[in-house]
UniProtKB/Swiss-Prot annotation:
GO molecular function terms attached to this record: (3R)-hydroxyacyl-[acyl-carrier-protein] dehydratase activity; trans-2-decenoyl-acyl-carrier-protein isomerase activity
Lineage, uppermost ranks: Bacteria, Pseudomonadati, Pseudomonadota, Gammaproteobacteria, Enterobacterales
Matches recorded under SUPFAM superfamilies: Thioesterase/thiol ester dehydrase-isomerase
Assembly mode: Homodimer.
Catalysis performed (reactions): a (3R)-hydroxyacyl-[ACP] = a (2E)-enoyl-[ACP] + H2O; (3R)-hydroxydecanoyl-[ACP] = (2E)-decenoyl-[ACP] + H2O; (2E)-decenoyl-[ACP] = (3Z)-decenoyl-[ACP]
Family: Belongs to the thioester dehydratase family. FabA subfamily.
Natural source organism: Escherichia fergusonii (strain ATCC 35469 / DSM 13698 / CCUG 18766 / IAM 14443 / JCM 21226 / LMG 7866 / NBRC 102419 / NCTC 12128 / CDC 0568-73)
Places the protein is found: Cytoplasm
UniProt protein name: 3-hydroxydecanoyl-[acyl-carrier-protein] dehydratase
Function: Necessary for the introduction of cis unsaturation into fatty acids. Catalyzes the dehydration of (3R)-3-hydroxydecanoyl-ACP to E-(2)-decenoyl-ACP and then its isomerization to Z-(3)-decenoyl-ACP. Can catalyze the dehydratase reaction for beta-hydroxyacyl-ACPs with saturated chain lengths up to 16:0, being most active on intermediate chain length.
Active site: 71
Amino acid sequence: MVDKRESYTKEDLLASGRGELFGAKGPQLPAPNMLMMDRVVKMTETGGNYDKGYVEAELDINPDLWFFGCHFIGDPVMPGCLGLDAMWQLVGFYLGWLGGEGKGRALGVGEVKFTGQVLPTAKKVTYRIHFKRIVNRRLIMGLADGEVLVDGRLIYTASDLKVGLFQDTSSF
């Protein structure tokens, strides 16, 4: 039985990383340090820009986050690829929330644009995922557009984020 709520705490997300939230066959989020959100504040099967599902999640920013110490020394900034990965993580999480089973794998993205950055002085990153399509056949796949905001200001956009759930990844 899927634990299907509208919001999830950090402990819930950590449970997902241990395979405890969506069951033994459900997709898992990564563990820290690669878990790129602290909470999911909204999940719906409708809504979003296409009325086919919406996820909103947040990451609290503080200067002690691991990536600020190495990217870059003297010029700390959150790597843009981590924001992109967070959006893929949320697409996979949504597929598990819908009851999908398998191991989540990012399959691609149409276009990514960066128009800002996350500095250690920021307070909060918000991720917004707008689902366009869910394929539920032999392969379960989510297709969505995403946005990353820092302290309420839009800084990244991604179109056609794709994540699939695989029963067997040995030949992937």
